[in-house]
Swiss-Prot record:
It is an enzyme of class 2 (transferase). It comes from Sulfurimonas denitrificans (strain ATCC 33889 / DSM 1251). It comes from the Bacteria. Fe cation binds at H107, H111, D293. This is tRNA N6-adenosine threonylcarbamoyltransferase.
Amino acid sequence: MILSIESSCDDSAIAITEIATNRLLFHKKISQELEHSVYGGVVPELAARLHAEALPRILEECNPYFKDLKAVAVTTTPGLSVTLVEGVTMAKAISIALNIPIIGVNHLVGHIYSLFIEKESYFPLTVLLVSGGHTQVMEVKSFTEIKTVAKSMDDSFGESFDKVAKMMNLGYPGGPVIEALAKGGDRKRYNFTVPLFQSPLIAFSYSGLKNSVRLAVEAANEEDFKDIAASFEHIATAHIIQKLKKYFKEVPPKTFAIVGGASANLYLRSSIEELLKPHGADLLLSELKYCSDNAAMIGRVAVEMYKESLFSDLSSLEVCPKSVI
């Protein structure tokens, strides 16, 4: 068994995964959304303090598994440095106390493996990662062979939802709030421009769209917000679809996956499903409960790393807020 810890942002989570079967034996997550919502976003120091309170409480529930643990895994990158440290400090203590190896896991690779929680993995895949911190397309051959072929030049897909929600004083996180509001709105009322539409670049950019929405919000009444939300969600998604169309002309998709917290957006999911139909490509999706940050996905990567004896050095293991894959 492997115990895995996730604390890269505002979710405190611990999981226990069986190595031989990939079975998830335990998983608990304590979200900090309520505490951060009053600030309109994550406050790093508050997040770290809440992790320091929540992680030990969850760990107490894992006592029955301690005697059977073969390794401890923890997210080390990317994320908020002050919150990553909380998880790594706990993982190091467990490693020393139980005399078991420690495995440092890349959070982004974890999101890819959210597709395979309690399942066997299979590759190659073309993966779209959409979250609060990242928007990128990757060609994935294994957990060690990942090539990024397109990424955001500024704001991410998920981050833009958070910022638009903040403009409307709708709280945090913005993704679910904007998605719910958009369902009752007119997607074509506001003619926002699709970012980088004329550009040959296969890349993403949300800063310009965000500014256009800000101007619309400032000129609107509250009853207009649902139409703004719907129009924004439509264009934010159309931007991804347009760039994927360009990429698919160069590299036709065979098996395509969407991962990350913002992959829970049902409009994005259905739009990509329609895009893939002419290609006859398979679409892989994480279960909705595993789209956001969780320790089960970290444990699933760690199982693969354990089998390859890819352990971290306890004395030199450090956090890295920024990571590129």
